[in-house]
């Protein structure tokens, strides 16, 4: 007797999505409150998610890992048709929007790393600009923070 392959469920419970995606059910509800994902309600008023939500949650997790704010993720999702399953080509276009920001962050982190050798332990990254060693710090007149590292 031949076994039939189990048919994939069209709709998933929040618990199933949480288990498959590795995020808490509360995170799913939060993402939904921010408009990043959508659910439908069954006759018992319980949330159910279409299977494509797994891909969207994966994208959210990736974007958050690289520091992309949820609002930016939402803007990117906003240009996609609702209920649309993202293709590899569309993912490439979507991720390219974030690449420039990621490159800028990498550049800043590399600059910070390279300046650490000059740190004297006071939290400042440059002895020549340190207000303790250089009370007349000219950069301080232009504002607070890492003035040499910030892009204006």
Curated annotation (Swiss-Prot):
SUPFAM superfamilies listed in its UniProt record: Putative DNA-binding domain (SSF46955)
DNA-binding region: 14-33
Domain HTH merR-type residues, every copy: 11-79
CDD domains from the UniProt entry: HTH_SoxR (cd01110)
GO biological process, one term: regulation of DNA-templated transcription
Alphabetized Pfam families for the sequence: MerR, MerR-DNA-bind
Signal sequence segment: none
Region (Might be part of a sensor region): 119-130
Disulfide bridge positions per record: none
InterPro entries: DNA-bd_dom_put_sf (IPR009061), MerR-type_HTH_dom (IPR000551), MerR_fam (IPR047057), Redox-sen_tscrpt-act_SoxR (IPR010211), Tscrpt_reg_MerR_DNA-bd (IPR015358)
Sorted UniProt keywords: 2Fe-2S, Activator, DNA-binding, Iron, Iron-sulfur, Metal-binding, Transcription, Transcription regulation
Binding residues for [2Fe-2S] cluster: 119, 122, 124, 130
Keyword rRNA processing in record: no
NCBIfam families linked to this entry: SoxR (TIGR01950)
Function: Activates the transcription of the soxS gene which itself controls the superoxide response regulon. SoxR contains a 2Fe-2S iron-sulfur cluster that may act as a redox sensor system that recognizes superoxide. The variable redox state of the Fe-S cluster is employed in vivo to modulate the transcriptional activity of SoxR in response to specific types of oxidative stress.
Subunit-level organization: Homodimer.
Protein name: Redox-sensitive transcriptional activator SoxR
Gene: soxR
């Amino acid at each position: 007797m031949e076994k039939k392959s189990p048919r994939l469920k069209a709709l998933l419970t929040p618990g199933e999505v949480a288990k498959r995606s590795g995020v808490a059910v509360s995170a799913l509800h939060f993402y939904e409150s921010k408009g990043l994902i959508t659910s439908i309600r069954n006759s018992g008023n319980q949330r159910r998610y279409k299977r494509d939500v797994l891909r969207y949650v994966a994208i959210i997790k990736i974007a958050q890992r690289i520091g992309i704010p949820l609002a930016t993720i939402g803007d990117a999702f906003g240009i996609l048709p609702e209920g649309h399953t993202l293709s590899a080509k569309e993912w490439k276009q979507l991720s390219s929007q974030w690449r420039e920001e990621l490159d800028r962050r990498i550049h800043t982190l590399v600059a910070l790393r390279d300046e650490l050798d000059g740190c004297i332990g006071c939290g400042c990254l440059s002895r020549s600009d340190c207000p303790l060693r250089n009370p007349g710090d000219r950069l301080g007149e232009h504002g607070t923070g890492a003035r040499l590292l910030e892009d204006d």
